[in-house]
């Protein structure tokens, strides 16, 4: 009697902020797990996304963007989280953007050169490159930087060549038992996912107006007798002016954020959601390591 083989491994998705790492993760999983927004630093936790297909289970670690600015406690912790996730994986997907190459990309590359894991280079947003003639020389430049396992031009947004990345990942998964049941897509708690959804809506509807000094704490997450969830979210900002910005004129902004967040939660939790949001000023939290620990920013380090 033959025992079927199974394959399982951890894959880190790394790159500087805003190159499309979260969008790629969501595409690889076939649904939204990691929050995506055009603002840098939207991913603050190492979210694990799990994709199981037959005998193959790929466990994706979505890192915060490695970036050079290390002044604030939150930035230092995010950089530490990103660096630590590179160290304990079977494979790394290094995401860069089109024909752009920055000192931050160089810094990530230097960290990868120190590691032992093979690296796939995903050149994202190739559909946005205006001068297509620039692409080939740039790919040749990238190929000369490191001995990459493969270099794949992709568009995480449209899905172009994402299946190629997935196929390379499957091919390099070691023989191992699966860590998670096959219907799992993330090991993050519903409470954590609720806070991420609210934070995404804050980023989306406040855009460049709102600095990164905003976080979300879920104060209450309980099942109700209607078969759904009652969720209370506390939005923490650093200044009174930011609080007014989040609330908006006559509460219009926070109402929109709440409506959109509730829709996403209901889709993710497959149950009705009653969501209430509050905004509170807590000055200096992004500089205070103790406050960051209490908000779960270092729970996995």
Curated annotation (Swiss-Prot):
PROSITE patterns recorded: G_ERA (PS51713), KH_TYPE_2 (PS50823)
SUPFAM superfamilies associated with the record: P-loop containing nucleoside triphosphate hydrolases, Prokaryotic type KH domain (KH-domain type II)
Gene Ontology molecular-function annotations: GTP binding; GTPase activity; ribosomal small subunit binding; small ribosomal subunit rRNA binding
Amino acids binding GTP: 15-22, 62-66, 124-127
G2: annotated segments: 41-45
Region feature G5, mapped onto this chain: 154-156
Pfam families in UniProt: KH_2, MMR_HSR1
Region (G1) residue spans: 15-22
Keywords: Cell inner membrane, Cell membrane, Cytoplasm, GTP-binding, Membrane, Nucleotide-binding, Ribosome biogenesis, RNA-binding, rRNA-binding
Places the protein is found: Cytoplasm; Cell inner membrane
Membrane topology: Peripheral membrane protein
Functional note: An essential GTPase that binds both GDP and GTP, with rapid nucleotide exchange. Plays a role in 16S rRNA processing and 30S ribosomal subunit biogenesis and possibly also in cell cycle regulation and energy metabolism.
Family: Belongs to the TRAFAC class TrmE-Era-EngA-EngB-Septin-like GTPase superfamily. Era GTPase family.
Subunit: Monomer.
Protein name as catalogued: GTPase Era
Organism of origin: Shigella flexneri serotype 5b (strain 8401)
Taxonomy of the source species: Bacteria, Pseudomonadati, Pseudomonadota, Gammaproteobacteria, Enterobacterales
